[in-house]
Amino acid sequence: MCKADAIELNTYALATDKRQTSAEMEQQLLDLVAAVTAAVKVPVAVKLSQWFTSLPHLVGQLEEAGARGVVLFNRFYQPDFDIETLEVRPTLHFSKPSELLPRLHWAAILYGHVNLDVAITGGVHSPKTC
């Protein structure tokens, strides 16, 4: 039997309904986090997109919902579409060192204002990157 030390929720929601507000989308995420943290005994971290309107506020709400950590930031895979074959082509673009700065920026903003762990993913390619 496998035992996890923690769970990372890697979520993604695409806003396609013009009637759905950003607050409603965030509430769906908060409800998911609350449900998962209530169902498991291990810490739960949430990997976030950098496109939330008020990231510090959302992170505070995630903490209240039971999250023990956040991961900055999710990188979304964007498939290409071949117009000749009308097929989706998967593409994988690795992170670049230039992606580190916004992650560090937001980690610094959150530092000292939240009581959960903050992790950064992407953008580090060598010890010199930092």
Question: Which residues does each predicted region cover?
Answer:
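Alpha/beta enzyme core
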Residues: 1-121, 125-130
